């Protein structure tokens, strides 16, 4: 895993620990969008995995059916 990938994953993990607990869980998918981002970046690399994570976050809204959506 490259250094930029590790940095991006570290930032997401930091968000999960420091910021996310203060807000109610609203993600419509499993795994959550932030966990999906970690998995996608680890599996596909920073650029391709990051793009997949952005698309996933854009699909996560109140009108989305959600459900199981693995990376």
Swiss-Prot record:
Subcellular location: Cell membrane
Source species, domain of life: Bacteria
One CC-aspect GO term: plasma membrane
Topological category with respect to the lipid bilayer: Peripheral membrane protein
Keyword Membrane: yes
Main location: membrane
UniProt keyword annotations, A-Z: Cell membrane, Membrane
NCBIfam families per UniProt: membrane protein insertion efficiency factor YidD
Function: Could be involved in insertion of integral membrane proteins into the membrane.
Family the entry assigns: Belongs to the UPF0161 family.
HAMAP family: UPF0161_YidD
Protein name: Putative membrane protein insertion efficiency factor
